[in-house]
Amino acid sequence: MWLICMAALFDMLYCSEVEESMERIFEMLHGACGLETEEMRGVLKRMSDFRTYVLFPLILHDDKLVVSPDMGYKDIEKEERIYVEKIIKKLPSLVWQSMVFLYIPEHDNWILGLMNTVFDTSSSRFSDSVGIYKKSRGRSEMRLVDLMMGMFRNNVSMMEKFGRGLAHKAEVKMKEIPNEISKEEREKQKEVLDKIREYGKSLGTREKQEQILKAQEIVFDTCIYLWRREEDRISFVLKVYLRSLQCKMLGLNKGALADDVNQEVSLLHSISHEILINTHNEYGIEVTAELIKRLFLEYMNIDEEYVSNVVEDVKKKKEEERREEEEEKKRKEEVVQRNVEELLRGEEEEKKGAKAKRKSKKKKKGSKKPEEKESEVEEVSENREAQEMEDSREACSKERNKEQKNESGRCYYKLHKRTLLWREEPEKIKKKWDSGTEERWKGKSIGEIREQKELHDISEISQLLKSQDANNFFICTGEYMKNGIKRWKMVAIAVLETRDWKKLGVVEVGLFKDKDEQNVIFHLMFRPTDLGRAGAVVRSALAKVDNMEKVDDTDDSLDISGFTYPKNTRSEVVRGLNEFRVVWRNPKNTAEVIRSLTVMSRPGGN
């Protein structure tokens, strides 16, 4: 937990105004993490460096995203405009910080002071940033990315001034190093100040200025590209929602810094400009888009090795998509072939029927041979059996239609037996997995099985899935093909609380259609997260992939359209407007709550 808090602290220091005291920040995070001030200072010292930043073109408010990269002022919801204007006024300062900010613990006061002095004393055409954003540019309205890119270009003129001041001040500080300290300590201080001086000089070069602008332009263009894809939009929205809930759980949503935690911390991200530009030049928009998406979703140290992993992941994804397209094409061809064969058989039967009819007219009534009578009886018998089967299906269908009519909007699902297994005792679960075909579950200890049971034994969620308001809670991913079976996922934000812990995360539901075109739930679990892993969990949950190589659709799956739980399963369901809660109680003492799972309504802004 303390690493999570320190990550939040480190980002806040990069984003907060100078007048925000570090003591106030330390005090706030001490309450959330339990770390002492000196411990936090020590971690910060180890984390400090000359990292470079990029800024995401988004505006967040509470638990939702209110302005997207390509959004103009007129498209913003009216009730959000006052808040958005407040953030727009802060954007020039935030853009400036992202371009030149560096945090060196021993020198943070004078560096931050110089940075603000240069910004405050320099003229800017974006002093009325709200007015500029409201204005239309030609026939098209100014988008958020256009506004922010203009701010970056405007701030370039200040970089040389700040760089000169930084280099000069570092030289002055070198001369002020006291002689009383040890030679080793003096060399350390001089080394740090020399790096600051060289960094200041680099800010005045055209090469450095163009690199900053190019990196930011790539981020803006890539965000526009990502925003056109629904799956990526959803991942951004879910990350914002999870981040907001986590801040509330850590107590970081209170006081003057609440907006900074939710707004600025989510927008500023550290990445090497050189790596970003080289990746874009070498691999193009698809790899860059995946890299930028992961940068937003996850706390990752992006280096050359990480980029190589992303490249491989994109290649695998494209190959999987190619296989899916081939499978889908093959499936369609098979359907066409079956239809053609059925049509030909139908035509052949019609010809035979017409021929038999002509022959029967020539014969006198009652002149049929015994063999023909026997054949006719067999045919009638077969037809009657088929008709009875069809009548049975129609009756079942009418009953289901009747139920659908009474409960309009409800969906029907079956629970696969691998999902139902988690309702058993850990010993029985282990025995079943050890003798099964899923390698990843073989050999697990009873302790591991017991831990996984807490996350997987949530079949009561099926009641929410089949309800009329399921879409108010679950986000559905796109369909994908695997081993010739159409699959998809449904994801919802939730909180699972046991007697020992309380965690935020997502409920994952994996589904496929069986041979009868019925929806079957083959995967169901709560996947916990923390502040640093929120994006990773979102990315995993929304990915069009699963680790089930084969799902046997001939297995008996439980139809849950009329499902009720055994009497010895002490659980209750509480439905609210914005949440669905399942409470599991001790069968021997119903006053004792063993677990509770609260599924929250899906976030707005998507």
From Swiss-Prot:
Residues 328-353, 381-401 have a biased composition (Basic and acidic residues). Residues 317-401 are annotated as: Disordered. InterPro entries: DUF3654, UPF0329. Residues 354-367 have a biased composition (Basic residues). Belongs to the UPF0329 family. This is UPF0329 protein ECU06_0090. It comes from Encephalitozoon cuniculi (strain GB-M1).
